[in-house]
From Swiss-Prot:
It is found in: Cytoplasm. GO terms for molecular function: ATP binding; four-way junction DNA binding; four-way junction helicase activity. It comes from Marinomonas sp. (strain MWYL1). Pfam families: HHH_5, RuvA_C, RuvA_N. This is Holliday junction branch migration complex subunit RuvA. Its main location: cytoplasm. Residues 144-149 are annotated as: Flexible linker. The keyword Protease does not apply. NCBIfam families: ruvA (TIGR00084). Belongs to the RuvA family.
Length: 200
């Protein structure tokens, strides 16, 4: 899995980009939210990526921060929402706006997104409400400025990892709380938390 690319932006034809990484040009699909934040051609870019593999294609999707990528991954799990529609949604509103609209069951706001009718909006609300609520608790959808920091909080990263492994948010939080504060990084925190849960 390609999780991140760092290189020179050599083409920008929304929604497609090309990034040169050590002489190799990566074709990347991106939302307008990401594209608006990119430098001019020739500038250095860092994109968090999601590789979608199908029988007849390999498509790389790029995002300006982990926040947007996490939301993309949630969206493409919704019945009837493919990657193109997910990018359209991310291009139309911020992650914070989407979370708010889903939690408030605001069908009208969601139908303003191109290609999203009433039935699709209702399905988004039903299928996303719990998923987005859990994601918000892991701080995946916190302020972009925080998400772009190079050094993330290892305990938050570890808690998010445990939830992605299938543990409930409450279980993950309790397990992390029992880890000694001298754990150096998220990997150490995860290992210690898992050992603690296995002892119970």
């Amino acid at each position: 899995m390609i999780g991140r690319i760092v290189g020179t932006l050599i083409e920008k034809t929304p929604p497609e980009l090309m990034v040169d990484v050590n002489g190799i040009g990566y074709e990347v699909s991106a939302s307008m939210t990401t594209i608006y934040d990119l430098p001019q051609i020739g500038g250095q870019v860092t994109l968090f990526t999601h590789l979608l593999v199908k029988e007849d294609s390999h498509t790389l999707y790029g995002f300006i921060d982990k926040n947007e990528r996490a939301l993309f991954r949630v969206l493409i799990k919704v019945n009837g929402i493919g990657p193109k529609m997910a990018l359209a949604i991310l291009s139309s509103m911020s992650s914070e706006e989407l979370i708010t609209n889903v939690q408030e069951s605001d069908v009208t706001a969601l139908t303003r997104i191109p290609g999203v009718g009433k039935k699709t909006a209702e399905r988004l609300i039903i299928e996303l409400r719990d998923k987005l609520g859990q994601a918000a608790k892991t701080d995946l959808f916190s302020a972009p400025a925080v998400l772009r920091q190079v050094q993330a909080d290892p305990r938050q990263e570890a808690e998010a990892a445990l939830i992605s492994l299938g543990y409930k948010p409450q279980e993950a939080a309790k397990a992390i709380a029992g880890v000694p504060v001298d754990a150096a990084n998220s990997e150490d925190v995860i290992k210690a938390a898992l050992k603690g849960m296995l002892r119970k």
